[in-house]
Swiss-Prot record:
Belongs to the FtsB family. Essential cell division protein. May link together the upstream cell division proteins, which are predominantly cytoplasmic, with the downstream cell division proteins, which are predominantly periplasmic. This is Cell division protein FtsB. The chain crosses the membrane at residues 4-21. GO terms for cellular component: cell division site; cell septum; plasma membrane. Keywords: Cell cycle, Cell division, Cell inner membrane, Cell membrane, Coiled coil, Membrane, Transmembrane, Transmembrane helix. Disulfide bonds: none annotated. GO terms for biological process: FtsZ-dependent cytokinesis. The keyword Transmembrane applies. It comes from Alkalilimnicola ehrlichii (strain ATCC BAA-1101 / DSM 17681 / MLHE-1). It is found in: Cell inner membrane.
Length: 95
């Protein structure tokens, strides 16, 4: 009976050792959990970056007309072949 109990105790200790320190044991699981969490944070950061880049691309695609209008009105830019006429009012007419 003692030998059986000693054998079962040894088996239990061996299995506990495998559970804690063996391949696929709790130490590996903890390390993998940390790695997974780091990867999730990286994915979240990259998703936010992708969203910002996508918004910038959409602005550039759809915002060209607005950009052109702003360049025309604020900077006085014209297209090639166009003629720019600026009407200057006299100070007497402005009053």
């Amino acid at each position: 009976m003692r030998w059986v109990l000693a054998g079962l105790t040894a088996l239990l200790l061996w299995l506990q050792g495998l559970l804690w320190f063996g391949e696929g044991g709790l130490n590996d699981v903890r390390g993998l959990s940390r790695s997974v969490e780091a990867q999730r944070e990286e994915v979240d950061r990259l998703r936010q970056r992708n969203q910002a880049l996508e918004a910038e691309v959409n602005d550039l695609k759809t915002g060209l007309e607005a950009l052109e209008e702003r360049a025309r009105s604020e900077l006085g830019m014209i297209r090639e072949g166009e003629t720019f006429y600026q009407i200057i009012e006299r100070e007497d007419d402005a009053r």
